[in-house]
């Protein structure tokens, strides 16, 4: 089933909404209600928060950049950057493990660790795909890629 390419207007709407979501999440995590309002997060979250904020900032800035120009090579480069930072956030979260599930820890700790490991693996695969995509775009030039 062939998909129709999105119009530039639709893509720009998506970039604008994504940038706005990054701002809203950053505000929610840092200002109100703040990460410490989440009952199962521990003070260890302060060790993860700088990378979370970096991820939100880079996501915001890349989406703003895509509003101006979104050629495939530029999108692939932005995706490489955001995926790399996301992996760093996930690895830091797994190492620090800023969660306290109280009486349910014996159930939720391994589930949460498993989800984090799955996300690290999936994000790493996604990063590899973006690196290959970027390389193909550099080799083949700006024309469409035919699989």
Named regions from a protein language model:
Residues 1-57:
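N-terminal signal-anchor transmembrane alpha-helix
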Residues 1-3, 136-147:
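Short, charged juxtamembrane terminal tails flanking transmembrane helices
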Residues 30, 34, 65, 91, ...:
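Membrane-water interface at transmembrane helix exits
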Residues 35-42, 99-108:
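Membrane-interface helix termini and inter-helical loops of multi-pass transporters
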Residues 46-56, 78-85, 112-123:
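Alpha-helical transmembrane segments of integral membrane proteins
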Residues 59-92:
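Loop-to-transmembrane helix junctions at the membrane interface
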Residues 82-104, 128:
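C-terminal halves and exits of single transmembrane alpha-helices
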Residues 103-140:
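Alpha-helical membrane-associated segments of multi-pass integral membrane proteins
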